[in-house]
């Protein structure tokens, strides 16, 4: 009950910040029971659930990473797959290497899950190339990219999902979005809301940081936070206002969308609609 209450509290924060579609990952249980429990709760509230049993290597498996990979791809996957749409892995230094990550993602694919990946957050490595190899919907973070990484992303269907809240919270260097846009990479922006490295549900904050520190124009930031996010989930029903798409939108109490970057930290969400129905309306004085 406590876990679900916390989930709903964060969901309400997201709605108030203008978010209508979100992905929820596991990865903080790291046991069969706790990973399955967290996904089962998330699946009650969003269709975009991601099995991330391979988030980090638990202390009990510190010198036995391959044993943990076997658990993740065996009993844990079997138990969690019914509650998940996606499979994810943290492919980076101190977590899982490229070969281990490939095994984990391929096991998920074999169970009918769609792949995505945490890649190149802490250091350059082979995560982005693996994402392209396996046609991952998204490579999250993409902080440390080589020219060949950018070229590979540009020629693929994999979205580079940038997470400014993580760099802000950890005082890390920001990725250079200008290089990605110049190469024709599809870019998404997301909050990366998690208690370890980016405990924010504010999309407007992430947009402001992306504009200030990552080289986004206001137009690029808005597109990446909407259509880019939809493409990172391979959704065609959300992300824009167009005939045949869901009427999901946020109405701002501002003269221009540019104020999302111009006035960081200011609540400018007046109303939020999902499928044409109001799910949040700002009340003055509340």
List where the protein language model places each region:
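A generic structural signal for residues embedded in beta-strands
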Residues: 249-252, 281
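Structural motif
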Residues: 20-21, 48-50, 85-88, 137-138, ...
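Divalent metal-coordination and catalytic microenvironments
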Residues: 18, 25, 87, 118, ...
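Short peripheral tails and domain-boundary helices/loops at the edges of structured domains
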Residues: 268-285
